[in-house]
Amino acid sequence: MSRLLRASILLLALASCGGGNSSAPQNMDDACAILRQRPAYFKAMRATERKWGVPVHVQMAAIYQESKFIGNARTPHQFALGVIPMGRQSSAYGYSQALDGTWDEYQQEQRRFGAKRDRINDATDFMGWYMSQSSAKLGISLNDAESQYLAYHEGRTGFANKSYLEKPWLVDVAAAIGRRSAMYAGQLSYCR
């Protein structure tokens, strides 16, 4: 086999290893199963919990809602007249679905210029940073997955202005996140 062909095969094999997972864990309703299937998730979330104080179960519930644990998740495309692509709904990307502007702010403030939204350790650190600021600025408990999610989704100004009250669907989503966080907390107490 020629050197060029061998090099091409090696390059293709390495490229397929990728940074973030592009598929969801098999059982997203079982925190222990998720962490057994993806041990790097637990390592990243524990590091975030130690650094920022955000419990693993709160991080898991938020990531479930934002990306279903898919590292390269993006918002859907928008179409004009149902067929003409007009770009994506927002710049949200990765596990945390962080917007470009908020991600840039995080990178600047934390001096993490190499951080990537499709790497679980960077995404959980971002969430920890954001949620700890929400706790400091808005008085939201780091254990309150429901309120933390509302502040995460609406932004801290939107949360302070209670913009979520005009979005009953979002209040329902946040309540579901609160329930999922409690479910994950119960499960994690048995498998850690």
Q: Where are the predicted features?
A:
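C-terminal motif of bacterial Sec signal peptides marking the signal peptidase cleavage site
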Residues: 13-16
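Catalytic glycan-binding domains that act on GlcNAc-containing polysaccharides
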Residues: 21-192
